[in-house]
Amino acid sequence: INFGAIKAILKKWGKKLVEYALKHKDLYAPYIKKHLCEKL
């Protein structure tokens, strides 16, 4: 894995990804909750 490339992508798109994630959190929040509950 090229971490430099990942950092560059995150630097460029990080804000957009965060905005998108917040806008669509209802799509993945139940999945994350289920996943976390299974791990705990």
Curated annotation (Swiss-Prot):
Transmembrane segments: none
GO MF annotations in UniProt: toxin activity
Annotated compartments: Secreted; Target cell membrane
Tissue specificity comment: Expressed by the venom gland.
Keyword Membrane recorded: yes
Entry keywords, A to Z: Disulfide bond, Membrane, Secreted, Target cell membrane, Target membrane, Toxin
Main location (coarse class): secreted
GO cellular component, one term: extracellular region
Quaternary structure and interacting proteins, as annotated: Heterodimer of subunits A and B; disulfide-linked.
Assigned protein family: Belongs to the ectatomin family. Ectatomin-Eq subfamily.
Name of the protein this chain belongs to: U1-ectatotoxin-Eb1a subunit A
UniProt organism field: Ectatomma brunneum
